UniProtKB/Swiss-Prot annotation:
GO terms for molecular function: transmembrane signaling receptor activity; transmembrane transporter activity. It holds the Pfam family Sugar_tr. This is Solute carrier family 22 member 17. It is a multi-pass membrane protein.
Length: 520
């Protein structure tokens, strides 16, 4: 999603007057206005006598009253990173500014739809197939979007691009998580997030170099076609955990054998213990022969639905409230754009470092509770004390809110992937990620209303953040625990009871250190 703010950034603009028409301005009078008052004509003349700029797509405060259209071309005073974008290509300003907001909404809806609808194929046909299919289609879709000749074509192809990129993100996340043992899951998940943050910085650098939005679109999407070489046998392996759950034992043995041979020291043969473990794999996995479930049967697992509801709501709020923490004084200048871009990426990287240091020590649930608490505190301070704080204090709490909301979003996604069983992990995690993408709609929705109601929206989101704090305490702890494989395992992942000791087979009752057996 890092490309959308650059592709839809409204540049500073003014009307190119040229030879002024008889009404002494570069603005066209609406056909319904047969006569303009003397005051209106004087205001139009004064507007023509100076260079007026605006970054508001509705041209509010820019156009003279009762004048809607510029007779000449628009002059765009340049973007921070590109010479022009789709807004300047088709003059999507003033009365056409709604198309820019519609493109932003469709792009986010593309991500939400991809997360939601590609989770089932990932569970049914495998993670590898979904990743290869969507990666292969990203390139043609992106190149086609760069060659589009109208804003309608751009919006359609951007929706499809978001749909496909969501499939790539979901499939790769599942494969990373299912490949690791319990002690490495957090590190691998955070490494993937840091790679994404690095991609944001790389995209900003490519935008500075390319200058043309069409060339930039081709540059970032066309190389995805090369990822089709991942389909070469033995190069990009299917998730062995998913193969075992689907009872494809021979394929799982083949994948595990390849991984074991790659990880063994150079020049050594595969050990006998590894060979015996691979041969006995079928006997040690007493799973049902089928892993297809009806929707009615899924409704019986109330604990799984409770975890999905809490984590989905938390992820939604963490993404929705993020735009409320923009630094004070963002006026649309190049320096403000760079500040917002670097601040968003920098706080995401800082959140990854914070989670890597604290989560394995204090647990997923505790750090998620702390992150949402900091998010709520930052919102309450900004809402209640905005008029009494200086710019430095406002910026400090805005950065705190950005940091904590980033950490909450990352950790809620990881925790959801760890409590959802393998049989439905694609669908469950896709639902969580789709809710997070829908939370991103709060920013274009606010722009659609010209910023009206921003305070009320922040109040509602802050109240929901406080509600998340209460609900997070109902979640189980998944630190150093095995991933649940079937629905029965996911149903046993519960929060430890506060009043009585849970039985030993509960998912939450796993000792941190193994106790010696006195009988031995």
């Amino acid at each position: 999603m890092a490309s959308d703010p650059i592709f839809t950034l409204a540049p500073p603009l003014h009307c190119h007057y040229g030879a002024l028409p008889p009404n002494a301005s570069g603005w066209e009078q609406p056909p319904n206005s047969s006569g303009v008052s003397v005051a209106g004509a004087a205001l139009a003349a004064s507007a023509a006598s100076r260079v007026v700029t605006s970054t508001d797509p509705s041209c509010s405060g820019f156009a003279p009253p009762d004048f809607n259209h510029c007779l000449k071309d628009w002059d765009y005073n340049g973007l921070p990173v590109l010479t022009t974008n789709a807004i300047g290509q088709w003059d999507l300003v003033c009365d056409l500014g709604w198309q820019v907001i519609l493109e932003q909404i469709l792009f986010i809806l593309g991500f939400a739809s991809g997360y939601l609808f590609l989770g089932y194929p990932a569970d049914r046909f495998g993670r590898r197939g979904i990743v290869l299919l969507t990666l292969g289609l990203v390139g043609p879709c992106g190149v086609g979007g760069a060659a589009a000749g109208s804003s309608t074509g751009i919006m359609t192809l951007r929706f499809l691009l978001g749909f496909l990129l969501a499939g790539v993100d979901l499939g790769v996340y599942l494969m990373r998580l299912e490949l690791c043992d319990p002690t490495q899951r957090l590190r691998v998940a955070l490494a993937g997030e840091l790679v994404g943050v690095g991609g944001h910085f790389l995209f900003l650098g490519l935008a500075l170099v390319s200058k043309d939005w069409r060339f930039l679109q081709r540059m970032i999407t066309a190389p995805c076609i090369l990822f089709l070489f991942y389909g070469w046998p033995g190069l990009f392996l299917e998730s062995a955990r998913w193969l075992i759950v689907k009872r494809q034992i021979e394929e799982a043995q083949s994948v595990l054998r390849i991984l074991a041979e790659r990880n063994r020291p150079h020049g050594q043969m595969l050990g006998e213990e590894a060979q015996e473990a691979l041969q006995e794999l079928e006997n040690t996995c007493p799973l049902p022969t089928t892993s297809t479930f009806s929707f009615a049967s899924l409704l019986n697992y109330r604990n799984i639905w409770k975890n999905l509801l809490i984590l989905g709501f938390t992820n939604f709020i963490a993404h929705a409230i993020r735009h409320c923490y923009q630094p004070v004084g963002g006026g649309g200048s190049p320096s403000d754009f760079y500040l917002c871009s670097l601040l968003a990426s920098g706080t995401a990287a800082l959140a990854c470092v914070f989670l890597g240091v604290t989560v394995d020590r204090f647990g997923r649930r505790g750090i998620l509770l702390l992150s949402m608490t900091l998010t709520g505190i930052a919102s309450l301070v900004l809402l209640g004390l905005w008029d009494y704080l200086n710019d430095a204090a406002i910026t400090t709490f805005s950065v705190l809110g950005l940091f904590s909301s980033q950490a909450s979003a990352i950790l809620s996604t990881l925790l959801a992937a760890e409590v959802i069983p393998t049989t439905v992990r694609g669908r469950g995690l896709g639902l969580i990620m789709a809710l997070g993408a829908l939370g991103g709609l709060s920013c274009p929705a606010q722009r659609l209303h010209m910023g009206h109601g921003a305070f009320l929206q922040h109040v509602v989101l802050a109240a929901c953040a406080l509600l998340c704090i209460l609900s997070i305490m109902l979640l189980p702890e998944t630190k150093r625990k095995l991933l649940p494989e079937v629905l029965r395992d996911g149903e046993l992942c519960r929060r430890p009871s506060l009043l009585r000791q849970p039985p030993p087979n509960r998912c939450d009752h796993v000792p941190l250190l193994a106790t010696p057996n006195p009988a031995l």
